[in-house]
Amino acid sequence: MSELNIDAEAFKARVELLHGKYREFENEPNSMVFALGSSNPENPYQKTTALHYWLMGYEFPATLIVFTPGKVVIITSGPKAKHLEKVVELFKNNNNGVELEIWQRNNKDVEHSQKLFKDIIELINTAGKTVGIPEKDVYEGKFMKEWKPIWDAAIKEHEFKLVDISAGLSSTWEVKDDKEKAYISIASKCSDRFMNLLSDEMVRAVDDELKITNSKLSDKIENKIDDLKFLKKITNDLSAMCPPNHKFTLDLLDWTYSPIIQSGNKFDLRVSAHSNNDQLHGNGCILASCGIRYNNYCSNTTRTFLIDPSEEMVNNYVFLLDLQKHIIENELKAGRTGKEVYESVVEFIKKVRPELAGNFTKNIGSLIGLEFRDSFFVLNSKNDKRKIQVGDCFNISFGFNALKDMKTNTNYALQLADTVILNEDGPKILTEYTKSKSQVSFYFNNDEVEKEKKPAASTKIPTNLDGNSKILRSKLRGDARGESQDAQKEQIRKENQRKLHEKLQKEGLLRFTAEDATTEGSETRQYFKKYESYVRESQIPNNVRDLRIHVDWRSQTIIVPIYGRPVPFHINSYKNGSKNEEGEYTYLRLNFHSPGSAGGISKNVVELPYDDSPDNQFMRSITLRSKDGDRMSETFKQITDLKKESTKREQERKALADVVQQDKLIENKTGRTKRLDQIFVRPSPDTKRVPSTVFIHENGIRYQSPLRTDSRIDILFSNIKNLIFQSCKGELIVIIHIHLKNPIMMGKKKIQDVQFYREASDVSVDETGTGRRNQNKFRKYGDEDELEQEQEERRKRAMLDKEFKYFADAIAEASNGLVSVESTFRDLGFQGVPNRSAVFCMPTTDCLVQLIEPPFLVVNLEEIEVAILERVQFGLKNFDLVFVYKDFKKPVTHINTIPIESLDFLKQWLTDMDIPYAISTINLKWSTIMQSLQEDPHQFFLDGGWSFLNANSDEEGSDESEEEISEYEASEEEPEDESAYSDEDDYSEDISDGSYSGADSEEEEGEDWDELEKKAAKADRTAGLRD
C-alpha cells in the first residue's frame, strides 16, 4: 500500500459532510458503525465498501469506522494508519467541531484488539442507544470473527437499537462533485470503446457464421481488459479527461459487470441479466451491454443491434430512440421524483404508441456512481420520496420486452441504456457510442437492401445546383456534386492532419528534455573491450620453443619470438598485414591497432581494441624475415583466416544481441491437443520442403518437422507480437503469420517472423490438348466441367480459410488474452516495393503487412511517429512512402514505387489511423535526419519538430526548389532501410573492402529513373503538339 495517495482535503470535507447529516437520517441514529472484513470481489457494491471509496479512494480491509457526536474513530492496522497521518494533521489544524482519531490494532495481539473493541463500544454507548448500520452488508474474514462476537454481545448487554442507514448514505453521496464527474466521464468513454470492440466482434461472428455462444463472446470481450496493447490505444484520450492532480492509470480500469450479450428469443432487460450459453443467433435483435468503472466509479451502456430486421422492428427501434430523447430532454428535471418521471413516460407511450405500453420495462434507470445500481433511488412508480438534483448521475436504462415480430412470428426485445449526468445547464449523455438506426442495422440478406435501394434509384436529380444559375460547374450534375463532396472530405482530412501534427509536436516536447541530448554531440562514447590470450605462462603451447612465429587457434593468438622470448598478440590487436619476397628472403609485416594510426578506428565504433591512455605504449607494426618462404606463406594464411573467423564471430555476436532466451514450452499432456496438419513453414528448419504439423500447447505453439524429432520451432504466447491471418482470396496460399517481440534462433539463423501456410490450389492444367474438353475446338464458355471445377475450387478455398481462421482463433484463445488475431483487408491494399520486388501490401487492424514474398514486412502502426510521402510531383507515375518510428534508433522503413493512383487512398487511410503524414517532392536523406534527431531530440522539437516536412504539403504538385523544401540535403540515391548510421560496424573491417562504393558508382554511370521519366514525358508532349 506504499503507493496509496489519499486526497486529504476531499477526505476531510466528506467526513464533515456525513457527520453533519447522519443525525437527520431516518430513525435519527446517535452513532454509525461500519465494519469491513475481507474484501468481497463478488459483491463490490456494498455500502461500507462504497464509503471507503468515497472517503479514501481505496478499500481498507479489516477496518472499523465509527461516527459519534463530535468524534470519528477509525480502528485499523499500523501500515494503513500511516496513510491517514496526513488527514489526522489536517483535522488537528481545523476540525470544524469534528475530531478524527486513528486507533492502531495489532493483528497478532488479540487481547489488544479486544480492548480497542470494548473501548469503542463504550464510546458508542455514551452517544446513545440508536446505532445506524448498513443492514444488508455482509463481510467475512479474520477481523470479522474477532469483532462480531464482541459486537453481538454488546448489542444485548447495552440494548442497542440497530437501524438501517443505507438510504441516508445514498442521499449523502448522491450529488457528484467535479472529480467524481470526471471519473464517471472516463469510465463512460472507456465503455464506448469496449462497446465498439464488442460490436465489431459480434458483427464478424454473424457475418462469418461462427459457432460461438453468447457467454463465449462475452468472455472474449471481458478478457480485453487485460490486453495492454488495446488499452494503450485509448490512454491518450482518457488522460486528457482526468481531473487536476490526477494521473490516468490503467490499473484503475475494471468491469462494472461482465459484458452481457443476448440473442435468439430469450431476453432479460433487468440489470441482473447475464449472457447465457445459447449460440449467438445472427437474426433479429442482439442486445449488448458494457459497463466499465474507473477509480471505482461506474458507467453503463446498452445497445440493440438489428440483424436483417423487419420493418416493424425498425419502426419500434426508431420509437425507442425518440423515447430516450424525450426522457432525457423533457422528463429528467431537477425537483421531480422518480415516480413522476416514470408515470409521465408511460403516459407518453400510451399517447404515441399505446400497443407498446404493456411491454415497457418497470423502471427507466437508477442512480449510478460508486454503486452500479443504487436501489434507494430508482426511477419507477414506487419512488415518490427522493427528488432529482443537479449533479445527479443516472443510468437511464429502459426498453420493450416480449415483442413479437408479425412477419417472422419470433420474439424479440429492444433496449437502450446510457450514462447521463444532470448539469446546471441540463442533462448530458456521457456514453456516446452510436445508436442511430443506420449504424446499428446490419443487412446480410441482400433482399432488404435491394428494397431500400430501389426508391433511391428513382429519385430525380435536381436541375439546378447553384441557386437560380443555369450554368453548372461540370458537364454532369453528378460530377459537380461529387466534386463538392470530395472538396469537403479533403478539407476534413486536412483539418484532422493539422490536429495530428499539433498533437505530435506537443507529445514530442513532453517526451524529451534537454538532458536527452548526447553529451558528446555526434561522437559515440568509446570504450576498451578487454581481451586476454593467456592467464599463466604455462598455458603457452610447448611448440614455441623453436622460436618461430606460431598461430594458436584455441587462444586466438599470434605468438611472435622477440629477443628469444615468445610474445603473444591477441588477434583483436591485429589490424592487417602483408607478405613480400625480396631475393631469397620473405618478409612478413604485421600491423597492430594503435591510437592515431592512418586509417584507424572510426569514431562511430563503440568497442576499441586498445586502451587509449596516455600512460600506455603501443607497437604499431613488426616485420619478420625468413628464408623459409613456404612457412611464411602458410603462417600468413593462418593469421588471415584467424582474423576472418574472429571478425565473423564478432559480427554474429552483435547480430544476436537482441535474441532473448525463451522459457521452455510446456506441453499439453491433458486433454486433446489442437493441431493443424499438412502445413509448410517459412523459414524452414529443414532443407527439404515437406508438409508437417503445428500444435497448440499450454504456453505456446510448436512446429514439429517430420524429418527429425529434434528439428522444431517453439513459439511462446508471451513472445508473439502480432498474430495475422491472411485469406487465400486473390492469393495462391492461405497464411497464419506470427511476428515476434524478440527474435529466436533457428539453427544459426535469427528469425523474427514465422509463417505457416498451405497452398490453396492444386488444380492441374492439361497442356497436351488430349483432354475431353480440348477435343471440341469451339467449345462454349461455361462448359459444365469447367464450371464444376471452378465451384469446387471456390469451395476448397472457403474451407481452407475457415480451417486456418479457426486455428488462429484457437491460438488466441489458448493465450488467455496475450494474443489477438488480426486479418488482412485486401480491399485496402496497394502495390509497392518494400524490398526488391513489387508486392501487394495490405493493412490489418494494427499493422501494415506484406506476407507473400520474403523478406516479410510487418509495420506496427502504433509504433509509427510520422509517415512521409516522397517524390509526389506532377507527371510522375509513382511515389514512395517512408515510416519513421517513435523509437528514433530504429531504422526507417521504405515502401517505394507506389502507383500515384493510391495517393489519395493512402492519405485518407493514414488519417483514419491517426498517423500524421507529410508530403515531399524529393527523396530525403534519412540517415542525416535521424542522426541529427538522435543527437538532441529536445532541440529538434523546439525547432519545430517535423514541421519542416510540411513546407511543401499544401501544394503537392509545385516545382519548388530543393532548398525550399527542407533544410536537410536531398539524396539522389535509391532509398534503403538504414540498418545503422555508422560507416563502419566493426573496427577490424578492412578499409579497402569496397563494399560502400556501389552507390557512388551508380551515380556516375548516368541519369536516374526520375530524370529519364521526365524526359520521356516531355518528348511525348512535344510529339503531341507536332501532331
Swiss-Prot record:
Belongs to the peptidase M24 family. SPT16 subfamily. It is found in: Nucleus; Chromosome. Component of the FACT complex, a general chromatin factor that acts to reorganize nucleosomes. The FACT complex is involved in multiple processes that require DNA as a template such as mRNA elongation, DNA replication and DNA repair. During transcription elongation the FACT complex acts as a histone chaperone that both destabilizes and restores nucleosomal structure. GO terms for cellular component: FACT complex. This is FACT complex subunit SPT16. Residues 8-28, 82-102, 208-233, 484-507, 637-658 form a coiled coil. It holds the Pfam family PH_SPT16. SMART domains: FACT-Spt16_Nlob (SM01285), Rtt106 (SM01287), SPT16 (SM01286). One of its GO terms (biological process) is DNA repair. The lineage of its organism: Eukaryota, Fungi, Dikarya, Ascomycota, Saccharomycotina. It comes from the Eukaryota. It comes from Candida glabrata (strain ATCC 2001 / BCRC 20586 / JCM 3761 / NBRC 0622 / NRRL Y-65 / CBS 138) (Yeast). Forms a stable heterodimer with POB3. The SPT16-POB3 dimer weakly associates with multiple molecules of NHP6 to form the FACT complex. Residues 1012-1027 have a biased composition (Basic and acidic residues). Residues 953-992, 1000-1011 have a biased composition (Acidic residues). Keywords: Chromosome, Coiled coil, DNA damage, DNA repair, DNA replication, Nucleus, Transcription, Transcription regulation. Residues 767-790, 952-1027 are annotated as: Disordered.
